[in-house]
Amino acid sequence: MSDLTGNRAGTGAGAEGGTGLGAGTGAEAGAAIGAGVGDDGRPVALIASRVRFEEKLLLEAFRRRGAAVAVIDDRTLSYRIGDPAPPWRVACNRSLAGTRRLEVSRMCEAFGVPVVNSSATVAVCDNKIHSTLVLHAAGLPVPDTAVALTPAAGEEALRRIGLPAVVKPVNGSWGRGLCKVNDIDAVEGVLALKESLPSPQQHLIYAQEFVRTPQRDIRVVVAGDRAVTAVHRTGDHWIGNVARGARTTRCPLTPELEDLALRAAKAVGGGLLGVDLLESDDGRLLVNEVNSGVEFRGAAVGDEATALAIAEAFADHVLDHADRGAPGAGPVPSQESDHP
């Protein structure tokens, strides 16, 4: 059994500058899991792919609360089954890639380290079929949705919800891979493309009604049991995503919006989340999806006080989660056995 080494990646120049998570840390950086240990030996592990605007504010928020922080580059993480647990009080999972985000949370939970978000929450949010099933089962309003397990069955699925419709990848973010299909020719083209893709996962068809909106959607940022802020995302394209050039403006956080966002967050397991809502032209308010890797620079709408308030709420939730502890604490079980 090997020990986890002391990886202090990003606790110095790399973290403050935001240019990388291992800057100036020496040869040991990235060798294995580890932490820059604070005075009490129990730092908050801020696990990230890179230090962006949001991570810098989170670092400041944790430190204002007297917490030692170890910034860990998720690209350097490795561990051996049976290793002792890293000396982390709690982990704040800010991994960019969905696959790494899920494995980071699973790793922390296996070691008995409280982590936000949980692997259960990440697994639900990062699979659009799973999340829509969960939201619908919780009684939340969602767009009319159909699923087909192969492209060959996709035409029937789309026929059931009607056109126009939107075909989405099961996994993905930032508005990538969405296809609006207006007629049967477009349907046949998209399904043929899906059939040609190499991965069986890419053959799954996840389709939703095209919800006609005032060319905008709503993002509600949630921290635990608190809806922190809400914004309208308005763009020139039907995909209302900041990564696609949408503009954000303040949205009044009405009791209806707050209730819907908190119910959606609770349904997927809670944590630090971005709940995306659609206002349809016919008066419906629908839960489109819930994001487990929420970015909040856009939600701050250029206002420093709002950005700080979001970071403070996130830090409070993570530290509260640390105080509650994590279920199933203990080392990752080894395959080694005393039995012959």
Where are these regions (language model features)?
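A short beta-strand motif that forms the metal-chelation/ATP-contact edge
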Residues: R89-V90, V220-V222, G283-G298
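A long amphipathic alpha-helix within ATP-dependent nucleotide-binding catalytic cores
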Residues: I239-V287, L308-P327, S334-P340
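Protein kinase-like catalytic core scaffold
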Residues: A165, Y206, V228-T229, L273, ...
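Phosphate-binding site of ATP-dependent enzymes
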Residues: C179-V268
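A short, polar/charged loop-to-alpha-helix boundary motif
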Residues: H237-R244, F296-A305
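Active-site nucleotide/adenylate-binding loops and adjacent lid/helix of ATP-dependent enzymes
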Residues: S2-L4, D39-G41, A48, P84, ...
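ATP-binding N-terminal substructure of ATP-dependent carboxylate-amine bond-forming enzymes
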Residues: M1-T121, L149
